[in-house]
Amino acid sequence: MKSIEDFMKKYELSFDGVTLIAGVSGGPDSMALLHALHHTVPASATLIAAHVDHMFRGEESERDMRFVQDYCEAEGIQCEAVQIDVLAFAAENNLNKQAAARECRYAFFQELMKRHRAEYLVLGHHGDDQVETMLMKMAKGTVGIGLAGIQPKRRFDSGWLLRPFLKLSKDDLLAYCKENRIPFRTDPSNSEDDYTRNRFRHHVLPFLKKESEDVHKRFQSVSEFLTEDELYLQALTKDKMNTVITSKSSSGVEISIERLLALPMPLQRRGVHLILNYLYENVPSAFSAHHIQVFLDWISQDGPSGSLDFPNGLKVAKSYHTCLFTFQRLQCENVSYHYEISGAGEEELILPGGSSLHVSGPGSTRKLQGNDVFATSPKQVQFPLYVRTRQNGDRVKLKGMNGSKKVKDIFIDEKVPLSKRDSWPIVTDAVGNIIWIPGLKKTIFEELDVTNNDRIVLQYRQHEKCRGLAKNETGY
């Protein structure tokens, strides 16, 4: 197949005497790949088909496995197949089905690479997959090289992962299968709209193809441009971060806040990426641009100290002019704060710990749902408002009860961890009345009249729950 030959020429690859693992599901994409490799690689190379039965569809998925095994036997291709109870793995590791399937699949590929000392893992992702992936990344707010989608060549284990079909469409591969009489299996779940990718595939991609039949080629060109730009910016960031990082070890990195904030914003964001990728071994999904900006806003604020929780036990501690990223347990620090909210217009207040309060200006008609949203007005309280940490003797007048209740007792009732109580935000009015404990309790000072033109709405966002940044930011 010319596509594979062009790919080898572009990336200066030689398959002489090497071992290649081809991921084969039994669908048209991977069967076209297996056929093309079988008729392209030299006789000195070893080609191994790798199939994973995720056990999602019982006997049907087992038939897919036998189909791949039978095809390989007929064509004289070595085949490695495995059955993995992915649903059980997902439950044990708190993953969704698709993420668990991918993790299990790539773990098997990695095992085969080691066992057979293979140089290359080759997969059948095509141009339509690339379009879907890039659109999904944009919709999620992915930053950096993740926006470039699927990489055609990247490091994998001790070798390389190759995707030679990214300039071909799904229709190209179906035509290749038809022309060469290549059998394949069809997964009925691909026709359902249960998964995000399928919704993009069924409803967005057809529209784009009507506008431009070669849209996959356009997206692949953009992906390559983005990758080249990002690699340059990453190299520049690495150079600049040498002056930002004051110390580092396997468990922690300390930086100068002043030096980080002195960098241009694109390098600040990538600097945070580099630190997280250095520290994490197996990282959750990538941060969005919003999450990165929240972190940078947090360290930009006045205040000598504070802490922020990242996924998988990573702590970030701000202390005067430095910031420490570490997996080690932090000593308790004074994280008290006291901020003013004028209520004159829309504003966002980033709090120590990474959470925030968003204020909608006077006249907001937003409906209130849950304890993360609260409305008030000059009719109910005296402005300005203040956001502070708890104080000894704090009491609050809750809706629907006589008298007042200790804030300490509310924290106990709501099972707020001891480590978070001293930094939990409390909103008061100008004379010290506690009017709201964000995320926990509302008070008698709430304004429910949406026609009140002086009404303002406050929304509490717990950004510390955001997920982490992956080492392979594309996820592919």
From Swiss-Prot:
What biological-process GO terms show up in the record? Answer: tRNA modification
Gene Ontology annotations for the cellular component aspect, listed alphabetically: cytoplasm
Matching entries from Pfam families are given as:
ATP_bind_3, TilS, TilS_C
Record CDD domains: TilS_N (cd01992)
* Coiled-coil spans in chain: none
Q: Carries keyword Iron? A: no
Catalytic activity, EC = 6.3.4.19
Catalyzed reactions per annotation? cytidine(34) in tRNA(Ile2) + L-lysine + ATP = lysidine(34) in tRNA(Ile2) + AMP + diphosphate + H(+)
Binding of ATP occurs at S25, G26, G27, P28, D29, S30
Protein family = Belongs to the tRNA(Ile)-lysidine synthase family.
Free-text comment on this protein's domains from its UniProt entry: The N-terminal region contains the highly conserved SGGXDS motif, predicted to be a P-loop motif involved in ATP binding.
Function noted in UniProt? Ligates lysine onto the cytidine present at position 34 of the AUA codon-specific tRNA(Ile) that contains the anticodon CAU, in an ATP-dependent manner. Cytidine is converted to lysidine, thus changing the amino acid specificity of the tRNA from methionine to isoleucine.
Q: What is this protein called?
A: tRNA(Ile)-lysidine synthase
Which organism is this protein's natural source? Bacillus licheniformis (strain ATCC 14580 / DSM 13 / JCM 2505 / CCUG 7422 / NBRC 12200 / NCIMB 9375 / NCTC 10341 / NRRL NRS-1264 / Gibson 46)
